[in-house]
Amino acid sequence: MTPLAAKRPLQLNDQGQLRHFLSLDGLPRELLTEILDTADSFLEVGARAVKKVPLLRGKTVCNVFFENSTRTRTTFELAAQRLSADVISLNVSTSSTSKGETLFDTLRNLEAMAADIFVVRHADSGAAHFIAEHVCPNLAIINGGDGRHAHPTQGMLDMLTIRRHKGDFENLSVAIVGDILHSRVARSNMLALKTLGCPDIRVIAPKTLLPIGLEESYGVRVFSDANEGLKDVDVVIMLRLQRERMQGGLLPSEGEFYRLFGLTEQRLKLAKPDALVMHPGPINRGVEIESAVADGPQSVILNQVTYGIAIRMAVLSMAMSGQNAQRQLNAEEAN
């Protein structure tokens, strides 16, 4: 498995600033660090009595989710509101798309209503890239998750969580455990960790839930024995089993998966004593993680949600700024 081809010029303006946020593939380390630093500065906003800054005042953010979501959609809404933007969240099940209107026509109509940023989640890999390149290139397009391909804001909020608790990435061992085959979060995390200089990225899963070619594509170490893979790691990122994307025969049973790969208190002892426990949600307790671990002292799962708002504020504000700068450059060139 190789990542979708990096489209660096598509994501960045002529000055190298973010204008769309579609994937972490091909983005330079300096830009990922800038996103993390910007998000760090926005965490203070969440502690204020009035949780608002005027960076997107007068702008409209459209959340267009073709897949169900709670955390991602809600945190994007909060992020946009804290930046003082107007927010529209499209309920696809009751929208014109359910009456036969194409994705292309739906988005072009929203663009005609003077939207400035689209946050799009779609079941098809590459949907956000297609929209940014062929449908609405003059708007800032943010990928809220596309098929198995990418979930870049989740990847970045996970990196912010790790950095705030562990500091630099250069001496860390990070294990990603679970359904790697169907996980866009795993792909974004592997890319982010590699770009930020993490020297030891471990992927732990049954062989039936491992894509082919992970080692070559992402520079990771692959383990099919959880006990071996978790030894002395600094961070454990658990992933749920995505039954809705599976075909029959990939797993004998959820009980068997929990026995061999579930993160229990006993299995967590194989990691370093201060290892972080992370999970992008939704959590399936007793399937990939024990409740005592999910709610335990090493868990930073709720911190991930908090940091997600700050990361999405950073991405929204940076993409809008980069898109505005490109428009100005285009106008100057036209004159």
From Swiss-Prot:
Keywords: Pyrimidine biosynthesis, Transferase. PANTHER family: ASPARTATE CARBAMOYLTRANSFERASE (PTHR45753:SF6), ORNITHINE CARBAMOYLTRANSFERASE, MITOCHONDRIAL (PTHR45753). Belongs to the aspartate/ornithine carbamoyltransferase superfamily. ATCase family. The keyword Transferase applies. GO terms for biological process: 'de novo' pyrimidine nucleobase biosynthetic process; 'de novo' UMP biosynthetic process; amino acid metabolic process. This is Aspartate carbamoyltransferase catalytic subunit. It catalyses: carbamoyl phosphate + L-aspartate = N-carbamoyl-L-aspartate + phosphate + H(+). Catalyzes the condensation of carbamoyl phosphate and aspartate to form carbamoyl aspartate and inorganic phosphate, the committed step in the de novo pyrimidine nucleotide biosynthesis pathway. Its EC number is 2.1.3.2. It is an enzyme of class 2 (transferase). Pathway: Pyrimidine metabolism; UMP biosynthesis via de novo pathway; (S)-dihydroorotate from bicarbonate: step 2/3. One of its GO terms (molecular function) is amino acid binding. L-aspartate binds at residues 99, 184, 240. It holds the Pfam family OTCace.
